[in-house]
A protein has these predicted regions:
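Sec-dependent signal peptide recognition
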Residues: 2-8
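Hydrophobic h-region of N-terminal signal peptides that target proteins for export
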Residues: 8-18
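Glycan-processing catalytic domains of CAZymes
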Residues: 19-411, 484, 511-514, 522, ...
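Residue-level detector of short, conserved catalytic/binding motifs and their immediate flanks
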Residues: 51-53, 131, 165, 334-336, ...
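Residues within well-ordered beta-strands of beta-sheet-rich folds
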Residues: 56, 136, 168, 450, ...
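Order/disorder boundary and secretion-linked terminal/linker segments
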Residues: 397-492, 523-561
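Short, surface-exposed tryptophan/glycine-enriched loops
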Residues: 498-513
Length: 561
């Protein structure tokens, strides 16, 4: 099947058959490993015009050295007392190791230039409904090597009709000497000649840049951008945007008094270790000394730290932040800024290597430490898996609302269009000890999948970029989740193998064609394990991960709007 844009495909389908319905974000469902379900249109309410969600996105993996990886969580698993042992062989030489990892991402210790990873990130953002990526350039680097790979991928999906996130640079706060060179660089690289202008995040009619406006910029730069000042804590001036939510969440306002944005964060910044504590490593950091209370890490809620096993999987602190943002008194705020997707790294500062901070302990870990004291949403290997991603999906849905899902009447077809390109092989270096990451499991790539019901049977069809291969047990698998049935370990009640089209009698599923019903489904090709997380990594899946497509059938009334 030749590649078509989302819009052209849907137009062709509609012109050929007036009973064909394009799916939308409301036709996604699923649940995380904790049993928390993706909220539906009935729970979110209708679309809230003008509301958007931004996500802090990091470009720095491998850009400051590829030594390692040195994973603090794995070091502590090997020796629980390693934080108090500066001479432990588990520690690298801080003079030659600028960065440590707090944990392992699902896609491995990747470099930000890995396009295989970038495509998966973009797919996840499309499915979540993210509107803008804020690039963390607060340390004086803008990482052009990475954005030169990211922007063409975003543009490709945009040109095919997918709603991709826009981009915005978030520069250094005032105290870090936010100068003009970084702004000039991104101006010359991407803005001056209107390169990737489809992807600019617009605010007040101009591309937004978060940096200090009172610098000696060129007049053409001052005229081109809408400026907002950066800070990490509650702003004291108007036209200042922040991401930290400390010491308490608040709403940033413009100079005209208009409420503009609010922050939502996984945990407070500076969840770091600086000195021995009774709970070794669990929350002594700058924030404790500044705000005179325990660090509010992932498991903090109702004024205390939840110490139950796996408490860090639930995103308790994040949920409190989300609930605050969603309160009725903040319905007029148009933008929520979520911190964050993928920091993963922490500068390795010790008494030997540090020249920035007055240290109270031999090691200083600023902002990240381990699974509990970190703030990334991107799925990880083990640990919280993809729970924070699906929590983010739910927040976006509640913040922005949802359209009515596509509903099929008798004989109608619902089409679900897939973002292709993610089945290309992976062949890219990771951190030094990882060598080259490879993945050649992509075989049958889904272009779109369709479902119809004539009142007696369901017809599922998968169209692939190339003619499908159906030679393996894991080839062209269809998974169904039918209400009232007990799902298996993967989360499904029925499996079908090795075909691109399945006609399934409703009676086989216990469904009645005279009644309205809903079911969830997923297509998968060449998975490597019976693990829901494998749907993110190997082969192709429509949709990826724990998300499923939602098919809604109503014999009395299809969605013909």
């Amino acid at each position: 099947m030749r590649k078509m844009s989302v819009l052209s495909l849907v137009a062709a389908l509609l012109s050929a058959d007036a009973a064909t319905r394009p799916a939308n974000l409301a036709n996604l469902a699923g649940e995380d490993h904790l049993g928390r379900k993706i909220v539906s249109r009935a729970e979110t309410g209708p679309v809230k015009p003008g509301r958007q969600v931004g996500l802090f996105y990091y470009l720095w993996m491998g850009q400051h050295g590829t030594q390692g990886p040195y994973d603090i969580s794995k070091m502590e698993a090997a020796d629980p007392d390693v934080m108090d042992k500066p001479d432990s062989p588990l520690w690298p030489d801080s003079a030659h190791t600028p960065m440590l990892h707090w944990g392992e991402p699902l896609f491995g210790y990747y470099l930000s230039t890995d396009e295989w990873v970038i495509r998966r990130h973009v797919e996840m953002f499309i499915a979540a409904g993210i509107d803008v990526l804020y690039f963390d350039t607060t340390n004086g680097y803008h990482y052009r090597e990475v954005t030169d790979r990211l922007f063409p991928i975003l543009q490709e999906y945009h040109d095919r009709g997918f709603k991709v996130p826009k981009f915005c640079y978030y520069m250094a706060p005032n105290r870090r000497g936010s100068g003009t060179s970084n702004v000039l660089d991104v101006w010359l690289n991407y803005y001056k000649d209107r390169k990737f202008s489809d992807l600019y995040f617009m605010w007040d009619g101009k591309p937004l840049i978060v940096t200090h406006p009172d610098r000696p910029y060129r007049q053409e730069i001052l005229d081109f951008f809408t400026f907002r000042r950066p800070t990490w804590c509650t702003p004291s001036k108007p036209d200042t945007w922040y991401w930290g939510g400390m010491p308490t969440q608040n709403v940033a306002v413009a100079s005209n008094g208009r409420r503009e944005m609010l922050p939502v964060t996984v945990s407070t910044p500076h969840a770091a270790m600086e000195s021995p504590t009774p709970q070794r490593g669990r929350g002594i950091g700058a924030s404790e000394f500044r705000w005179r209370k325990d660090v509010q890490s992932r498991s903090w809620h109702h004024g205390r730290l939840d110490t139950r096993e796996n408490a860090s999987h639930y995103g308790f602190f994040l949920q409190e932040q989300m609930d605050w943002a969603l309160a009725p008194e903040r319905e007029d705020v148009p933008l929520a800024f979520v911190c964050q997707w993928n920091e993963w790294l922490v500068p390795f500062l010790t008494e030997k290597s540090n020249d920035l901070y007055k240290m109270r302990h031999w090691i200083h870990l600023m902002d990240e430490y381990n699974m509990e004291s970190s703030r990334d949403i991107e799925p990880m290997k083990g640990g919280f898996q993809d729970a924070y991603y699906l929590q983010l999906v739910n927040f976006v849905r509640r913040w922005k609302g949802l359209p009515d899902p596509a509903v099929a009447g008798k004989g109608d077809t619902v089409v679900f269009v897939e973002p292709t390109g993610d089945c290309a092989p992976r062949n890219h270096p990771g951190y030094d000890a990882c060598g080259v990451y490879t993945n050649f499991t992509g075989r049958n790539e889904f272009a779109d999948v369709c479902v119809s019901c004539d009142g007696t049977k369901l017809v599922f069809t998968a169209n692939t970029v190339k003619p499908p291969l159906c030679d393996r047990e894991t080839s062209m698998n269809l998974f169904l989740r039918v209400p009232g049935k007990e799902p298996d370990a993967l989360g499904y009640t029925h499996r079908y193998r090795r075909a691109a089209r399945y006609e399934i009698p409703l009676a086989d599923l216990g469904l009645d064609g005279a009644q309205r019903f809903e079911l969830q489904f997923k297509w998968s090709d060449n998975r490597q394990a019976d693990d829901p997380m494998d749907f993110y990594v190997n082969g192709d899946a429509a949709p990826r991960g724990r998300l499923n497509y939602l098919f809604v059938y109503d014999p009395q009334q299809g969605n013909r709007s």
